[in-house]
Amino acid sequence: LVPSVLEGTKTKGVNGEFTLGENIGDLGGLGIAVVAYKKYLEDNGLEDVERQKFGDLNSEYTGFQRLFLAWARVWRSKARPEMAAQLLAIDPHAPNEFRCNVIAANIAEFYEAFEVEQGSTMWIDPEDRVTIW
């Protein structure tokens, strides 16, 4: 995987062995957030599709969609190519676009929330998805 800002350059992609520990942490963290939200719904006798109101705001998004959109917002960033290349070499975290997209694409509820279908750029075959715990 090569960050989009570095596509077409000679920069090597993400070193999966170098980022493995942080990738596991990200996947575990988002997975726990999904489990916690499901428990909240269950404990309160709710279904996700009923959760159209958020505080005083009406929302066009379901709770699961908001959960994944909040996850995505955390990883918004912009970097110059030089900085992106430097971070690839020294940072044990995957680039933010992968921390966002690849982690979410390994969570089954993401597919349900956004009706992601095979052929989408976000699709990972179920047997190839990674689960933690």
Q: Predicted regions: what is each one?
A:
Residues L1-W133:
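Zinc-dependent metallohydrolase catalytic domains
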